[in-house]
Amino acid sequence: MSKKIVLALGGNALGDDLAGQMKAVKITSQAIVDLIAQGHEVIVTHGNGPQVGMINQAFEAAAKTEAHSPMLPMSVCVALSQGYIGYDLQNALREELLSRGINKPVATLVTQVEVDANDPAFLNPTKPIGSFFTEQEAEQLTKQGYTLKEDAGRGYRRVVASPKPVDIIEKETVKALVDAGQVVITVGGGGIPVIREGNHLRGASAVIDKDWASARLAEMIDADMLIILTAVEKVAINFGKENEQWLDRLSLSDAERFIEEGHFAKGSMLPKVEAAASFARSRAGREALITVLSKAKEGIEGKTGTVICQ
């Protein structure tokens, strides 16, 4: 049975530099086209953690050495990352589709996502961006005015505000493109964060979590399924411990209980489970799947992954 699927890719799965990204999108595109070949409508979203951090750092470094080089706000850095990633991803998807004899247009949409100016996240930056640093490197960057936090045992990363998405500004455009039979790449990096001021949309200094933005998009375009891709095949409780348990299905009540018990790492699995549960809760019959990219096709068939449902 054909489904309308929002597929959320992680920014870390797209490589750490230009060469790595070009290789990664080819592998990613093969898995995405596997789903399209099955008859599913696939809307692709993606993270931008490494990429937006590099863009921001590059312009900051240039501004320190070149008087005429501007400091770019985070909203503009997110917009740049949407074009940078979308360009490679849409071309890789187009090539993979044509190689299989599938004539389906691919479009990358510059997408704005509304956030609340009073969201408490602006007072407590938590969203990791950019490269990993050692503790010593983190101390030096802190002295330079950056905020860094330890990221799930992998090192230290810069963090910025991560408000919850309220509205997808270009949602009608996404719907129109999907209805016209196109593969749409949208809400890249969680979307460009904007605050509504009357008829004006003002860029916000933040990076929206792409899993939360993907869940909101999936709700607003009436998707059947949200697939959140990660580095592991299934969600686990007691991860890394002797009593580690991998989960095939996760009810909303169990998801809430495991979140309260602290089973999922902040900045890693926690936002994925929270976003998946939010989508599943939004309407009866909606399901979210968390799995690894190479198993997405099997996950839809119920053979692997963790399904979050009512």
Swiss-Prot record:
<dbReference type="GO" id="GO:0019546">
    <property type="term" value="P:arginine deiminase pathway"/>
</dbReference>
<dbReference type="InterPro" id="IPR036393">
    <property type="entry name" value="AceGlu_kinase-like_sf"/>
</dbReference>
<dbReference type="GO" id="GO:0008804">
    <property type="term" value="F:carbamate kinase activity"/>
</dbReference>
<comment type="similarity">
    <text>Belongs to the carbamate kinase family.</text>
</comment>
<keyword id="KW-0808">Transferase</keyword>
<dbReference type="InterPro" id="IPR003964">
    <property type="entry name" value="Carb_kinase"/>
</dbReference>
<dbReference type="InterPro" id="IPR001048">
    <property type="entry name" value="Asp/Glu/Uridylate_kinase"/>
</dbReference>
<protein>
    <recommendedName>
        <fullName>Carbamate kinase-like protein YqeA</fullName>
    </recommendedName>
</protein>
<dbReference type="GO" id="GO:0005829">
    <property type="term" value="C:cytosol"/>
</dbReference>
<keyword id="KW-0418">Kinase</keyword>
<dbReference type="Pfam" id="PF00696">
    <property type="entry name" value="AA_kinase"/>
</dbReference>
